[in-house]
C-alpha cells in the first residue's frame, strides 16, 4: 500500500517539473512513510512514489520499478493477491525476477501481456505504467475502485496522483475554475461519482478503467473490466447451495488476502460483515488477532456492545475506543487533512479514529466493506422492492392512494417514495443530501443545471429481479466507491493498509450468482452472510437490526459543530464564490436547528466543502507544514 504521482509534459522536462514532482511526492508521506523513490526519462515523464512496506520489506519492493532493459516502468499502489500464481506463469514464459514483491509481478505482467494483464489481476490497485520508447503513459484502477487515481490535464502537461490535492495544487492548475455540474453532483451526493473532478480539467480514473495518454495528447479512457451484475435464473444459487458456496468463497478470500510480512488485524463492528471477516481471520491465525472497534455516546449508533460480545466469542485481542460529541471539533483538522478531495460522508469521523487505533498496533487490517452492496444488505433494497407494484399505477393514483393509507399502522403503509415520478427518482432521493427545493433556496444558480446522474437512470418497474439487479448495479458503481474512498483516505492518513476480502473478485463473481431470495428474507438483507456467520458464532449474538457505522451528526451540527457552521458557512461567502445565497443558508440552518427540517447530510456536505477548500486549495508552498 503506497502513494504514486507522476507528470507527463509536451515540451520537455525542466528542473521546475522535477522539483514539483518531488514536492507532490512529499504531500503523500502518510501514505508511505517507509520509503520514497523518483524516476524520470529526462525527456517527458517523471514519477514519484511513497511506500508503506507490507510484502518484501527490503529494497526489492522499491519503486518506481523498471525492467532490466528499461522498456517498462511502473508505480503501483495496492496489493495483488494472485501474484504468486501469475509469477509462476511468467517464470514458465521465461521472465526472471529479482525480488519477492507483488509489484515486480505487476511490472513483468504488463511487459509480457500488455494491457490484457489488467484483466488477470485479482487485487486492489491503482497504477501508472510508462514506456519510454513510445512515451505512452497508462493509468489503471481496480474494477471496484478500492484504490484511488486522480488526474489533471492540459495540452502542455498531464499530472496524476493517489490524492486529488496533488493534481490541483501544482503550478499549472487553475484552482478558481469550478465545474458547476460537478459542484451540483457533490452537493447532492456528498461525493463525486465516476470520473468526475470538482475543478475543470480534473477527474478520476473510474473503477475498472484505464487511461492512455501521450505528451500533448488528450486522455483516452477505456473500460477493461466490469463487475458481474447477475446471471440467468437457471444458473442462480439458492438455499444451502448458496450458503455453502458463499462460506467457502469468503473463507478462501480472507486467507488469500492474509499474505503479509507484517502483523495483521481487523476492524470489528457490531454487524455481520466485519465479524464474519474477523472470525475467518482468527480461525486461520496462530494467536489472538488484534480487532479494533469504535463506540459512541449515542445509543442509536453505538455498536460497542455487540462488537465486544463478538470479540469474546471469537477470542480476539480486542481494542475499543469511544468517540464523543466534544471530539468533533478536535477531529475537524484531521478530517480536512485526510480527505484530499471534497467528501461529505461523516462516518469519516469514526473511520479516522478506528484507523488511528489500529495503526498503533498493526500496519494492515481486513474490513467487511462490500457486503451490503453485494448481498442486498441496505434497508432501501427491501423498501423499493416491496413498493414496486405501486409504480405500475399513474403517479396521481399513487399520490391519492398513499394519502388514503395514512390512517393505517406504519408497517401496513407503503413507503413515502411511491409518490416520486419513477423508482429511479426515489432511489436518487434516498442518496441525496440536498434536493431540488434545497438548491432553489441555498444555491439558486445550480437549481436548474442538467444532472449527470446516468448511474441513477430512471427504470420502469419491470420484474422484481430486474429492479433488484438494477439497484445493486447502482450501488456497486456509485455508492461502493464512495465507501471505499472514505476507508482509504482515513486509513492511509494513519499509514494503515485496509484489505477488503468481501470484494475479492472471486466473491464478487459468486455474489452475482446468488439469488436475491437467499439474501432478502423477512424484511432484512444479507441473510446468506448472516447464516455464514452463524456457523462461527452463537446465532443469538448476531443482532437483527442493521446499524450504520456513523455518528450523531444531526445533533453535532446544532451543538458541538455550530461554531464551525457559523464561521465557515454563515459569516462569510462560502466557496466557491458566487454560487450560494447566504440568507437561504441561514434560513436552512435555522430550520435544521429548530427541527422543522433534517438537513444533516446537506449541511455537512456544505461544511465539508469549506473545510476542504481552506485546507487544500492553496499553492504547494505550504506542504511541508502539513506532513510534518
Please provide the spans of the model-predicted regions:
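Active-site adenylate/phosphate-handling loop in enzymes that bind or generate adenylated species
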Residues: 143, 353-411, 484, 490-507
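Compositionally biased, low-complexity linear motifs
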Residues: 45-47, 157-161, 383-392, 514-524
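Cysteine-centered catalytic environments shared across enzyme families
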Residues: 1-339, 351, 355, 535, ...
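Short secondary-structure boundary/capping segments
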Residues: 335-337, 379-386, 623-624
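Active-site proximal helix-loop segment of RNase H-like, two-metal nucleases, encompassing DDE(D)
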Residues: 339-342, 569
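Adenosyl-5′-phosphate
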Residues: 1, 23, 116, 174-175, ...
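Acidic-residue sensor for enzyme active/binding pockets
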Residues: 79, 102-104, 303, 369, ...
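Residues that scaffold the ATP/ADP-binding catalytic core of kinase and kinase-like folds
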Residues: 89, 170, 374-377, 510
Amino acid at each position: 500500500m503506497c502513494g504514486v504521482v507522476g507528470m507527463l509534459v509536451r515540451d520537455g522536462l525542466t528542473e521546475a517539473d522535477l522539483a514539483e514532482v518531488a514536492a507532490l511526492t512529499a504531500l503523500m508521506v502518510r501514505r508511505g512513510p517507509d520509503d520514497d523513490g523518483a524516476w524520470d526519462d529526462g525527456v517527458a515523464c517523471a514519477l514519484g512514489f511513497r511506500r508503506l512496506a507490507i510484502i518484501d520489506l527490503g529494497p526489492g519492493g522499491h519503486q518506481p520499478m523498471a525492467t532490466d532493459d528499461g522498456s517498462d516502468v511502473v508505480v503501483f499502489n495496492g496489493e495483488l493477491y494472485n501474484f504468486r500464481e501469475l509469477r509462476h506463469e511468467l517464470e514458465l514464459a521465461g521472465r526472471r525476477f529479482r525480488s519477492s514483491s507483488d509489484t515486480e509481478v505487476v511490472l513483468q505482467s504488463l511487459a509480457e501481456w500488455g494491457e490484457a494483464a489488467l484483466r488477470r489481476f485479482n487485487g486492489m490497485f491503482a497504477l501508472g505504467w510508462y514506456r519510454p520508447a513510445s512515451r505512452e503513459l497508462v493509468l489503471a484502477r481496480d474494477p471496484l475502485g478500492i484504490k484511488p487515481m486522480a488526474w489533471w490535464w492540459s495540452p502542455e502537461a498531464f499530472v496524476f496522483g493517489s490524492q486529488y490535492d496533488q493534481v490541483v495544487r501544482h503550478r499549472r492548475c487553475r484552482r478558481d475554475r469550478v465545474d458547476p455540474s460537478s459542484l451540483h453532483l457533490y452537493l447532492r451526493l456528498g461525493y463525486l461519482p465516476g470520473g468526475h473532478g470538482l475543478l475543470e480539467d480534473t477527474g478520476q480514473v473510474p473503477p475498472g478503467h484505464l487511461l492512455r495518454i501521450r505528451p500533448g495528447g488528450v486522455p483516452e479512457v477505456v473500460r477493461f473490466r466490469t463487475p458481474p451484475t447477475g446471471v440467468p435464473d437457471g444458473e442462480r444459487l439458492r438455499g444451502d447451495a448458496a450458503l455453502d458456496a458463499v462460506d467457502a468463497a469468503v473463507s478462501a478470500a480472507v486467507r488469500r488476502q492474509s499474505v503479509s510480512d507484517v502483523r495483521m488485524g481487523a476492524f470489528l463492528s457490531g454487524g455481520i460483515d466485519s465479524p464474519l471477516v474477523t472470525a475467518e481471520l482468527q480461525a486461520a491465525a496462530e494467536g489472538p488477532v488484534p480487532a479494533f472497534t469504535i463506540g459512541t455516546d449515542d445509543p442509536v449508533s453505538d455498536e460497542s456492545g455487540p462488537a465486544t460480545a463478538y470479540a469474546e466469542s471469537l477470542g480476539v485481542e480486542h481494542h475499543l475506543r469511544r468517540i464523543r460529541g466534544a471530539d468533533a471539533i478536535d477531529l475537524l483538522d484531521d478530517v480536512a487533512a485526510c480527505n484530499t478531495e471534497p467528501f461529505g460522508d461523516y462516518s469519516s469521523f469514526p473511520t479516522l479514529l478506528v484507523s488511528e487505533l489500529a495503526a498503533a498496533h498493526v500496519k494492515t487490517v481486513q474490513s467487511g466493506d462490500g457486503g451490503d452492496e453485494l448481498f442486498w444488505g441496505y434497508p432501501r433494497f427491501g423498501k423499493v422492492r416491496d413498493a414496486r407494484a405501486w409504480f405500475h399505477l399513474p403517479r396521481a393514483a399513487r399520490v391519492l392512494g398513499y394519502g388514503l393509507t395514512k390512517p393505517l399502522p406504519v408497517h401496513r403503509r407503503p413507503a413515502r417514495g411511491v409518490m416520486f415520478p419513477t423508482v429511479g427518482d426515489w432511489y436518487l432521493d434516498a442518496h441525496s443530501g440536498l434536493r431540488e427545493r434545497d438548491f432553489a433556496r441555498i444555491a439558486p444558480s445550480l437549481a436548474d443545471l442538467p444532472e449527470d446522474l446516468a448511474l441513477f437512470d430512471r427504470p420502469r418497474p419491470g420484474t422484481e429481479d430486474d429492479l433488484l439487479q438494477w439497484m445493486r448495479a447502482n450501488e456497486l458503481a456509485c455508492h461502493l466507491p464512495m465507501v471505499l474512498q472514505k476507508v482509504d483516505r482515513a486509513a492511509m492518513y494513519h499509514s494503515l493498509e485496509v484489505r477488503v476480502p468481501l470484494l475479492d473478485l472471486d466473491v464478487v463473481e459468486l455474489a452475482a450468482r446468488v439469488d436475491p431470495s437467499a439474501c432478502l428474507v423477512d424484511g432484512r438483507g444479507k441473510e446468506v452472510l448472516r447464516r455464514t456467520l452463524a456457523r462461527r458464532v452463537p446465532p443469538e449474538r448476531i443482532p437483527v437490526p442493521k446499524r450504520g457505522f456513523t455518528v450523531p451528526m444531526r445533533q453535532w451540527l446544532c451543538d458541538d459543530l455550530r461554531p464551525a457552521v457559523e464561521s465557515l458557512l454563515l459569516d462569510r461567502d462560502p466557496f466557491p464564490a458566487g454560487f450560494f445565497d447566504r440568507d437561504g443558508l441561514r434560513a436552512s440552518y435555522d430550520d435544521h436547528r429548530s427541527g422543522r427540517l433534517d438537513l444533516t447530510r446537506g449541511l455537512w456536505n456544505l461544511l465539508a466543502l469549506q473545510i476542504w477548500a481552506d485546507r487544500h486549495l492553496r499553492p504547494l508552498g505550504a506542504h511541508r507544514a502539513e506532513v510534518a
